[in-house]
A protein has these predicted regions:
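Interaction-mediating elements
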Residues: 2, 22-320, 341, 435
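C-terminal motif of bacterial Sec signal peptides marking the signal peptidase cleavage site
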Residues: 17-20
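Transmembrane beta-strand segments of outer-membrane beta-barrel domains in Gram-negative
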Residues: 199, 338, 355, 408-609
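Outer-membrane beta-barrel pore domains and translocons
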Residues: 230, 254, 301, 332-334, ...
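Outer-membrane beta-barrel initiation region
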Residues: 239-242, 247-436, 513-520, 528-541, ...
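Extracellular loop and loop/strand-boundary signature of outer-membrane beta-barrel proteins
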Residues: 280, 362, 403-407, 507-513, ...
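Extracytoplasmic gating/loop element in the C-terminal half of outer-membrane beta-barrel translocons
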Residues: 342, 603-683, 687-697
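Outer-membrane beta-barrel "beta-signal"
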Residues: 722-726, 756-770
Length: 770
């Protein structure tokens, strides 16, 4: 195997050498291939990466920041561009970037301008090149010099009301004496002032009314800065006057607005109207939303001071309603005496409320082929309050192979029905209207029933849930599962199945999962996604991260009631409801992921997660569907799904045995855009699962502080992703690097002694792993 890797390495070196020789194949004589562009600065506060966006001409892209593969693919094409093969290679490849003196000069000028905007007025940029054959390397040497400092800060605001208003808000100002004279910060302050005034009635204000005067003293690096807030002027020729605050006057609803027709109010197709709590509502034939739904989603009311933030929140509120397709809010000025007022028109376009969908799919369960079909009906406005009702029927059939003798047939049949209804508000007794407006939650009620008929057993599953979901500041998502009830019932188990598996008593998980059981749980989940693409000094800081936290609790209320009622336990020492024992456990998970953008083609991603589930009280085991597993497309990718752990347990072919109560996961991934819609990845994964208690059928699986770190599995591999805009198809191939199931050096470290048939795992998935 070592020789194989040596041959592979030698072959790769030869290919790269040949590719480098042909890199200039299509570079004309007298021209140069732009091979590299580097920026160097002498100021630690100015990172070269922050100036990269001002470079007008960049070299051909590199895969994983190493190889200009697309250039080499382009150069594989022949000179006859009419041939199909040559066209294809040129389409997926990347034409050589020919060095342009004009573009280099433009880049030099843009970098100089950017430095001066950052406050380095004396900055200079020198450009140099290094030529080797038909390749050229371009260098920009930035000498920043001393930055200009704001020595004094004054305000010239002729409007006394605004002057007093901003004075009260001065602590939040971005401008401070002693700061670097950075044009980007000055512009951010203009926007901050504008946003503040738009939230306080100044409907016609924009940042063009805010300007600056900067005076410098010759021979120094000091700036006397004055911020000017100009008076209002409707037109250039008009006289100036004070900015007016606007108040909301009338609010009108138009519920059948057609975006393809004129938005002039007198041209709209309106047949009828009504008034609700003083709000006129105009509609065409029939009002499809309850009037209260319209008024409850407003964040402003007649008599309120105009607030742009409330307007945007109103857009968001109506955008959540599935009964609506578009929302447009218009304001018309209405001067009443000395008071400036705004008449508001909330124009709504309804969506298609009813739909039917049919799905047909093929199934493959461990090599057993089958088919499934489903039909669903959806109503997005069930009670005229934008409630979304869904009901879905599903059926599946599969032929099971590999069964031993003693079973009546080998057919697997499944029928299922699920239904749910979502309300676009927080439904709970005694909750105030103010709370409902503040927390724009969705309430969901759901019911599911599933019937499974297999040769080994007949199983039915029923569940019900009540949950809330809402978004906070567009970054945070909350979910509360107020109650989830799941009931598993097995009215028939074949005698052969009992004899072969259940009655042997060796597998506690197996026995537990083929008993009638009840799970009553509640939970909470928190998801935070930072905003990538924030603008700092005119550079895109697209580093982003996410945090996910889940907590779940089951059986505690029932256990307390059982003890209080002094209910007698069954023969297994468990409390039961109608003869069915219920699960009791606590489960918590934490997950962190971060993405670091290197450039527009390359990024680095990191992920770490931990989870623990603890059975107690009325249960000795976590329900199988609540346990953890390791391996697979979103875990340690050197192992197939549910093929790793727990601990150093090597597995016995029974997936039930390869589950645990504790999970650790960590991954790093280098992602690179390849060509067209394809992306590549190089990854390293680490992790495993463990049990809390020691079980005979899972030797080496229990978690122990003095050895768990020795049982961390490690994998490495390559990935190919196809970005289809709406979703990503992912193909990952992983190799085992450290295998905790073995103690001998040769098998414990397969990275040193690799064996493809033993150590490779292929995965297909949709979306990124983290």
């Amino acid at each position: 195997m070592r020789k194989g890797f040596l041959y592979l390495f030698t072959f790769a070196v030869i290919i790269l050498s040949l590719a480098s020789c042909t890199a200039t194949k299509y570079v004309p004589d007298g021209s140069y291939l732009l091979d590299e562009v580097k920026i160097h600065t002498d100021q630690k506060n100015v990172r070269p990466s922050s100036l990269r966006m001002y470079v007008r001409q960049n070299p051909n892209a590199k895969w994983f920041s190493l190889i200009k593969t697309q250039l080499y693919v382009y150069n594989l094409s022949g000179r006859d561009s009419t041939k199909w093969g040559n066209k294809f290679l040129r389409r997926i490849g990347d034409a050589p970037v020919i060095y342009s003196e004009t573009e280099a000069q433009r880049s030099q000028d843009e970098i100089t301008k950017a430095m001066r905007n950052m406050g380095y007025m004396a900055a200079t940029v020198k450009r140099s090149t290094k030529i080797k054959k038909k390749k050229i390397k371009l260098y920009y040497e930035v000498t920043a010099g001393d930055p200009y400092i704001v020595n004094s800060l004054k305000y010239d605001i002729r409007d006394p009301k605004i002057a007093d208003f901003l004075k009260q808000d001065s602590a939040k100002s971005l401008l401070k004496e002693g700061m670097i004279f950075d044009v980007n910060v000055l512009d951010a302050e203009r926007q901050r002032i504008t946003d503040k005034l738009l939230r306080n009635g100044y409907y016609k204000f924009n940042k063009d009314y805010v300007g600056y005067t900067a005076d410098t003293v010759r021979g120094t690096y000091q700036v006397d800065l004055t911020l000017h807030l100009h008076a209002y002027r409707a037109h250039v020729s008009d006289s100036v006057k004070a900015h007016q605050q606007y108040w909301i006057n009338k609010i009108n609803f138009i519920t059948d607005y057609d975006v393809l027709q004129s938005s002039a109010l007198n041209s709209m197709d309106i047949n009828d109207s009504l008034h609700f709590k003083g709000y006129p509502i105009y509609y065409k034939d029939k009002l499809y939303l309850r009037p209260k739904m319209l008024t409850d989603n407003l964040r402003f009311a007649p008599g309120d001071l105009f607030n742009e933030q409330d307007v945007q929140q109103t857009y968001s509120n109506f955008g959540r309603l599935s009964a609506l397709k578009y929302t447009n809010i218009r304001f018309l000025e209405n001067q009443v005496g000395d008071t400036a007022k705004l008449d508001c028109y909330v124009m709504l376009t309804k969506s298609k409320h009813k739909s039917v969908a049919f799905e047909l799919e093929g199934t493959n369960s461990a090599g057993d082929l089958g088919a499934a079909a489903s039909v669903s009906f959806q109503n997005r406005n069930l009670f005229r309050g934008s409630e979304t009702f869904m009901i879905k029927f599903r059926g599946a059939y599969e032929v099971i192979s590999g069964l031993q003798a003693g079973y009546s047939n080998n057919n697997y049949t499944e029928y299922g029905v699920e239904t749910s209804i979502n309300f676009p508000n927080f439904l709970f007794p005694f909750i105030s209207s103010d709370f409902k407006r503040k927390i724009r939650a969705t309430t969901e009620f759901g019911l599911q029933y599933n019937y499974q008929l297999r040769p080994e057993f007949l199983r039915t599953m029923a569940s019900a849930n009540w949950s809330y979901k809402w978004t906070q500041r567009q970054k945070i998502q909350h979910r509360i599962d107020l109650i989830n009830i799941a009931f598993l019932y097995l009215p028939r188990i074949s005698e052969r199945f009992k004899e072969d598996y259940i009655n042997k008593g060796q597998n506690h998980i197996f026995q537990y999962n083929y008993q009638d059981r009840l799970i009553i749980n509640m939970g909470y989940s928190y998801n935070y996604n930072s905003v990538g693409g924030s603008i700092i000094n005119n550079t895109i800081a697209s580093n982003s991260y996410s945090i996910r936290f889940n907590f779940e609790s089951a059986g505690n209320v029932m256990y307390a009631l059982s003890k209080a009622a002094n209910i007698r336990k069954n023969s297994n020492g468990e409390y039961a409801i109608l003869g069915i024992p219920y699960a009791q456990y606590l489960k918590g998970e934490f997950d962190f992921a971060k993405n670091i953008r290197i450039d527009y083609r390359n990024s680095f991603a990191f992920h770490a997660g931990v989870g623990i589930a603890v059975p107690y009280g009325n249960a000795k085991t976590i329900p199988f569907e609540k346990q953890y597993f390791s391996g697979g497309a979103n875990s340690v990718r050197g192992w197939s799904v549910r093929d790793l752990g727990p601990g150093s347990f090597a597995g016995n072919g029974n997936l039930l045995d390869q589950s645990g109560d504790i999970k650790l996961d960590a991954s790093i991934e280098y992602r690179s855009k390849l060509f067209w819609k394809f992306q590549g990845a190089v990854f390293i994964d680490a992790g495993n699962i463990w049990t809390i208690r020691s079980y005979a059928n899972q030797p080496g699986g229990v978690f122990k502080f003095d050895r768990f770190y020795k049982q961390i599995a490690v994998a490495y591999g390559l990935g190919l992703r196809l970005d289809l805009d709406f979703f990503i198809l992912r193909f990952d191939g992983g190799m085992k690097a450290v295998n905790p199931a073995y103690e001998t050096r040769k098998e414990h470290f397969p990275i040193i002694h690799p064996k493809f048939s033993r150590d490779f795992a292929f995965h297909f998935a949709v979306g990124y792993p983290f």
